[in-house]
């Protein structure tokens, strides 16, 4: 039996919260005389289920975040060439979410029309892509 296929199936089980040990899976495969094609089919099915579950989680995070979903603001569709200053590289580095993981605050300060809201939305969108809870609200809505 191919260890990498077994490891992939086990990773899917873990992601899908299916409680089965590697030994139990191996025993099940051997007891039921699974062929290599059978194991491939099982692997593809659980990989598909894991991907579908992951996508559903991301969509739920996006819905709960209150970010606009029709035309999402992302780092990919932000024009960094329009930003000037000495900390532009830090702004481009926000996509890695390293500030979040290092427990640092991010303040976006500047005049109107410079892309602060776009960057905030892109940051929230990226958090949702990593299944992190996000809630987007504009400053003007805080006053209400």
Region annotations inferred by a language model:
Residues 14-70:
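Interdomain "pre-motor" coupling segment immediately N-terminal to P-loop NTPase/helicase cores
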Residues 73-97:
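N-terminal pre-Walker A segment at the start of P-loop NTPase domains
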Residues 89-101, 109, 123:
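P-loop NTPase catalytic core of nucleic-acid-dependent motor ATPases
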Residues 101-103, 130:
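Short loop/turn elements that form and flank the Walker-type P-loop nucleotide-binding site
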Residues 103-119:
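Walker A/P-loop nucleotide-binding motif
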Residues 124-137:
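Post-Walker A helix-loop "phosphate-sensing" segment adjacent to the P-loop in P-loop NTPases
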Residues 137-144:
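A short hydrophobic beta-strand->loop->alpha-helix junction that borders the nucleotide-binding pocket
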């Amino acid at each position: 039996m191919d260890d990498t296929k077994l490891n992939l199936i086990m990773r899917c089980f873990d992601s899908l919260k299916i409680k089965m040990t590697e030994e139990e899976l191996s025993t099940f495969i051997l007891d039921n005389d699974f062929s290599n094609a059978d194991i491939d089919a099982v692997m593809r099915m659980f990989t598909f289920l894991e991907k579908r579950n992951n996508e559903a989680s991301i969509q739920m995070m996006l819905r709960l975040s209150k970010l606009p979903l029709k035309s999402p603001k992302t780092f990919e569709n932000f024009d960094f060439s329009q930003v000037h200053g000495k900390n532009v590289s830090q702004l481009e580095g926000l996509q890695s979410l390293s500030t979040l993981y290092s427990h640092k605050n991010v303040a976006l300060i500047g005049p109107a029309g410079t892309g602060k809201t776009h960057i905030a939305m892109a940051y929230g969108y990226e958090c949702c892509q990593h299944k992190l809870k996000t809630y987007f609200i504009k400053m003007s809505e805080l006053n209400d």
